[in-house]
């Protein structure tokens, strides 16, 4: 009789434990949290339903089901390298979260791994980003495009690495976001992107009279004019050419008198070469 009472008491305790929380969504969330987000909500619901929605029994069933021979990849969260980390973000504003992670295991990650949203607030429509397979002890940065909620407040979400077969592994990455009117995170990241874009543009030559505020056509015209100028100064005819023109007077005569005065004035004729710079310097 006493044995029957003990069995009855255990059965009643089982029922009372199941009736402690009637909201199945709460049980699924608690089950997932206790497992460190190693299982998706559908998997949590499967084990809970199998154990009559008893949280403790479901956790035991999960660990009994897991095979100890599975070699789970390893991942450690290194640091948050988000541009403007710690600043609040305005409502309904796009931003980028970047985390530095490391493969702390002894084997390379399998192909097809990803960083996946697992719980809390999901910022935007992106719930997964592919991550390349890291070698042992290799470090890499992973970025996720997000959008802040439309209502100011404090928000949080969780992300985890996941294999192609759905096995979660590594540290849980938390997103804790402060949404405030007048937040600077969006502006900070925009300025950083503009600076990066400016630094990656081809460098312009600053030689000559380059004006950074002038139009490209103006600078191009000035450059072409500079090419036409003699770097030694104003253009002058070569001295040999001048002397050649002057020496050409040896073979001709110059009549510098009107027709009416030809009888009284003689015609000047140069019979010797002129070496000086002035053609009439010698008589």
From Swiss-Prot:
Function per UniProt: May have a roles as negative regulator of innate antiviral response.
GO biological process: innate immune response; macroautophagy
Lineage: Eukaryota, Metazoa, Chordata, Craniata, Vertebrata
Domain of life per record: Eukaryota
A single GO molecular function term of this UniProt record: ubiquitin binding
Underlying gene: ilrun
Positions with biased composition (Basic and acidic residues): 219-230
Start-end of Polar residues biased regions: 241-254
Species name: Danio rerio
Cellular compartment(s): Cytoplasm; Nucleus
Protein name: Protein ILRUN
Cellular component terms (Gene Ontology): nucleus; phagophore assembly site
InterPro entries named among the record's database cross-references: C6orf106_UBA-like (IPR039517), Ig-like_fold (IPR013783), N_BRCA1_central (IPR032350), UBA-like_sf (IPR009060)
Keywords assigned by UniProt, alphabetized: Cytoplasm, Immunity, Innate immunity, Nucleus
SUPFAM superfamilies, per the entry: UBA-like (SSF46934)
């Amino acid at each position: 009789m006493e044995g029957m009472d003990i069995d009855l008491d255990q059965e009643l305790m089982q029922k009372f434990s199941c009736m402690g929380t009637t909201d199945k969504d709460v049980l699924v969330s608690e089950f997932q949290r206790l497992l460190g987000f190693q299982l998706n909500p559908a998997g949590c619901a499967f084990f809970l339903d199998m154990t009559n929605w008893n949280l403790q029994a479901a956790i035991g069933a999960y660990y009994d089901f897991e095979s100890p021979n599975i070699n789970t990849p390893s991942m450690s969260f290194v640091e948050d390298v988000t541009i403007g980390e710690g600043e609040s973000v305005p409502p309904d504003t796009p931003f980028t979260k970047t985390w530095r992670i490391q493969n702390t295991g002894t084997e390379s990650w399998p192909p097809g791994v990803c960083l996946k949203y697992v719980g809390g607030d999901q910022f935007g429509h992106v719930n997964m980003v592919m991550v390349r397979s890291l070698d042992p002890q290799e470090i890499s940065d992973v970025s996720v495009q997000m959008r802040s909620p439309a209502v100011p407040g404090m928000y949080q979400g969780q992300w985890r690495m996941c294999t192609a077969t759905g096995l979660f592994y590594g540290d849980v990455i938390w997103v804790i976001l402060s949404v405030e009117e007048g937040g600077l995170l969006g502006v900070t990241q925009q300025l950083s992107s503009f600076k990066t874009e400016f630094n990656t543009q081809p460098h312009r030559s600053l030689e000559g009279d380059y004006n950074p505020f002038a139009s490209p056509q103006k600078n191009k015209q000035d450059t072409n004019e500079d090419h036409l100028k003699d770097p030694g100064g104003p253009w002058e005819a070569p001295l040999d050419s001048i002397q050649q023109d002057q020496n050409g007077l040896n073979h001709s005569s110059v009549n510098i008198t009107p027709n009416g005065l030809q009888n009284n004035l003689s015609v000047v004729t140069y019979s010797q070469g002129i070496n000086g710079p002035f053609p009439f310097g010698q008589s």
